[in-house]
Amino acid sequence: MSAKKILIYYPLMEWYIQQGLIVTKVYGMIHCKKCKIFKSFGELVCNERRKGDIDAKYKVIGEEIKTIGNSSYGRTSMNKAKHNKTSYETQQEYKKSVGSPYFRDADKYGEVYEVQKRKHNTNQNMCIQLSSATLQYAKLRMLQFVYEFLYKFIDKKDFNIMYMDTDSIYSAFASDRIEDLIKTELKSLYEEEKSLWFPRTDTPENTTYDNRTAGLFKTEFTGDGMCALCPKL
């Protein structure tokens, strides 16, 4: 890894340093008080989705709360500087707009022009630290799964990472069951630590509960082949 002047959250940087990364220069630091300010919101999303899994009458609510949870990230990552002001103008008005430093683009529809302009003022009131933290914590979790689980418990000849997204990983395994690929000398440790990575399987209730627990890896799809871009790792 090599980078210059990047914004990186301390938990992710700490993990990188533990792996051997050397930080040669720090340009600035933003100090904040550590707290779980969105804990209740996260628990609400998970619990409502669990209710939808258990009782069909709550299924619609579970799907809606999923959308709310996902949009909380998407909304806070919005770059309002890219927003345009749209107006519909006559040819004479259009000619004036073309000379404006705020002009961006235009389309003609009959005798009317649809003109796109930059806004004179942009109110940057999005909580971008939330979306930034979401991305960096997601990256940290994916790296932990690869380096602290896959590379640790499974021989590299028995799997191949094919594709990775923000919160998902697609891999080819030499067996239908991960348990069959665990290194012999680490099977006991795997049994102790597997609940840190996957939903519990001791009871149906625990499995259903853990399937909606953030940070655990669940099977979304299985198949015999896949065409994919290189993994984002």
Where are these regions (language model features)?
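Conserved acidic
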Residues: 1-233
